[in-house]
Amino acid sequence: MNSRPAEKIDNNDGQTETPRSKTVSTINSTDALAMVEHSSELTLSITTPVGTKFVCRTPFIGTHTDKFLLVEMPKISADDLQYFFQEGFWMNIRAISPRGEGALIHFRSQLMHILQEPVPMAFLSIPNTMQVSQLRKEPRFELNLAGKVLFDEHRGDCELRDLSRSGCRFITPPLGKTYQVGDLVALEIFSDLRGTKTFPPLTGKICNLQRSLHHARYGLEFNEEGRNNAKNLLAQLKFNGTKLTLNAEKKA
C-alpha cells in the first residue's frame, strides 16, 4: 500500500477541505469498494473530449464479476444525459465510506455500457487501484439512538448512527428538513427509552451529507461544547457486543 501527503479534496457537497488524516493511500479496488455501502451516493465528475465538465450524483448499486461498477442512471435532464453519458467517456468518481475512521474513496473510471431495460443503469470500468483518504483522527462507535435535531426554530426527528469525541453521523426522515454543509445544529439524544429525557446537546456544524430513498445522512463536526458533551455521552453508554447502547437497554 502506497501513501503520500494529503491534498485538498472536495467534500461531498463540492466544498474544498483538507482531510484530518495526513496521508492518502493507494489500495486495490476490491478492498476499496468493500468500504462503500450499497445504495450510497457516488459523485461523478465527467469531462467530455472537448473539455466540458459536468458533476452529478447517483446511487451505487454494486459490482459485476469484478469487471464493472454498476450505478443507477442519474436523475438529470434528457439533454444532459444524452450529451454527458456517452459510452467511452471518462469520469472521476468520489465515494464516502462512513465505517470505522471514515474514508473518502476516489478513482478514475470509464463509462463502458448503458442498459435501459428492464431498469436503467450504467456499467463503469473498475481500475486496479483506488485512492483512499482517511477522514477522521479516531474511530467512531456504531449505535442507534433516537433524538431531535435543532436548527434555528426548527426541531425534527433524527437518529444517531455513530459517535466519536469529535464528530458523529445522524440520519433524518426522507421528507424531513434538509440541512446544508456549514449549518450549525444541535442534537438532543434521548437518555431514556420513552424519549422523555435528553443528554446535553451535541453541537457543531454539518460537514457532509448524503441522500437515499429511506433517509438523509449527515456528518457533524462538533464544536468545543459538542466535544465535551460527546465525551460525557460516550461515558454513559455500554457495548452490547455489536454496538453502543444506553444502560437502560441493558436492563429492559
From Swiss-Prot:
The lineage of its organism: Bacteria, Pseudomonadati, Pseudomonadota, Gammaproteobacteria, Vibrionales. InterPro entries: PilZ_domain, Split_barrel_FMN-bd, T3SS_YcgR_PilZN. Residues 12-24 have a biased composition (Polar residues). Its main location: other. Residues 1-11 have a biased composition (Basic and acidic residues). Belongs to the YcgR family. Gene3D superfamilies: Electron Transport, Fmn-binding Protein, Chain A, predicted glycosyltransferase like domains. Pfam families: PilZ (PF07238), PilZNR (PF12945). Dimer. May act as a flagellar brake, regulating swimming and swarming in a bis-(3'-5') cyclic diguanylic acid (c-di-GMP)-dependent manner. Increasing levels of c-di-GMP lead to decreased motility (Potential). Binds bis-(3'-5') cyclic diguanylic acid (c-di-GMP) with a dissociation constant of 170 nM in the presence of 10 mM KCl and with 100 nM in its absence. Binds 1 to 2 c-di-GMP per subunit. Only 1 c-di-GMP is seen in the wild-type crystal, while 2 are seen in the mutant. Depending on the concentration of K(+) stoichiometries of 1:1, 1.43:1 and 2:1 are determined by isothermal titration calorimetry. SUPFAM superfamilies: PilZ domain-like. GO terms for cellular component: bacterial-type flagellum basal body. It is found in: Bacterial flagellum basal body. Residues 1-24 are annotated as: Disordered. One of its GO terms (molecular function) is cyclic-di-GMP binding. This is Cyclic di-GMP binding protein VCA0042. Residues 134-233 form the PilZ domain. Keywords: Bacterial flagellum, c-di-GMP, Nucleotide-binding.
